[in-house]
Amino acid sequence: MKEIFLLKLGEIVLKGANKRQFEDKLRQNIRRRMKAYGNFDVYLMQSTVYVEPMDDEADIDGAWDACHKIFGLVSLCRCRACEKDIDKIYDTVEEYLGDDLDCAATFKMESKRSDKRFPLTSIEISQEIGGRLAEAHPTCKVDVRKPEYTVFVEVRDLAAYVHGPAEPGAGGLPTGVGGRAMCLLSGGIDSPVAAYMIAKRGVEVECVHFFSYPYTSQLARDKVMELARLVTAYCGRMTVNIVGFTKIQEAIRDNCPEEFFTLIMRRFMMEISQRIALGDGCGALITGENLGQVASQTMQAMQVTGAVVDIPIFMPLIGMDKEEIVTIARKIGTMETSVLPYEDCCTVFTPKHPKTKPTIGQLITAEKNLNREALIQEALETVEKITVKYDDEPFI
């Protein structure tokens, strides 16, 4: 019989009365993702999502790779289905996993029988299949404590399923069950990771990027768009809002004390982001801020920059070490793009001696020569909305 994927649910199984809502959203997300790889049937039974190719044209390998990036799944098994007959099960194990056993020094059997109508117990299935495999592969010894390879047999209601060790899923909750949020996306390492981490909790993520042409180049903008595209491999398509920020930065440079440049810039970014977010149905902002990492990310600095917004600000990286953030960036594939040497607006007009312990009063005084509302409205008129999908052509 053909290959099939068994995708095991994560914390969804712990949900109560609204569990069905989470399951339906997960199934919907998987169906949408599989469309790019051919015709697949997606159905859910016994806390497992079954993904079954419906014709020979389906891209099995591409679909399998994509399943690893779908939030809500804790483990994935690539299986061969067969009839619920002990001889057919053995033949399928031999055909599907025999080469793997020949490459291993030791193995063990693990069986699970959820269909109690099957005449053999789980232990008896393991004994029967394991005994035959030991005879057929004399160089691969049985070791139930620390095996080099494990053969799994699951006898379920529809069929028996044979597979090797499961692979880890993306975890988290299905995209779309946790509302919508707007991520302030720069070209650095942190903000793409922050977007990924909040998306992992079931949140649909949009992004806003502040573009300061001609102080920043088209390459810098393309870099940010590519980071957004890479994140969509996990969270699905997203909208990126590009905001023209040049006039605001020039106004800050010309009218404000230098030590407050970055903080005032951040306050404008937060307020503009909130207005775009509320217009797009987002209930929170997301930033890649990390306590103490730079001068604008002290506790006092974050207090004054966050004071201009009313909606929650999610900061998933706030207590992480930089190396932890880098590890996640490498895992999700954004690191190589983040380190490309194209500066963004955060590096424009950087003060030599930034204020690290500002107060709200100091910021209000520093901004007194700015027409905040006029500058914000002018920036909002420049917003360009771009929809990004993972299967788009790379931007750089």
Segments from the language model and where they lie:
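RNA-binding accessory domains that recognize and position tRNA/RNA substrates
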Residues: 1-182, 192-238, 307, 355-360, ...
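Active-site adenylate/phosphate-handling loop in enzymes that bind or generate adenylated species
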Residues: 128-133, 166-178, 249-332, 378-395
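Structural beta-sheet core signal
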Residues: 183, 207-209, 242, 287, ...
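Conserved G/P- and acidic residue-centered "switch" motifs that form tight phosphate/ATP-binding loops
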Residues: 188
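A conserved beta-strand->alpha-helix junction
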Residues: 228-255, 342-344
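Small/polar glycine-rich anion-binding or flexible loop at a beta-alpha turn
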Residues: 293, 341-349
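A short alpha-helix-loop-beta-strand transition element characteristic
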Residues: 333-341
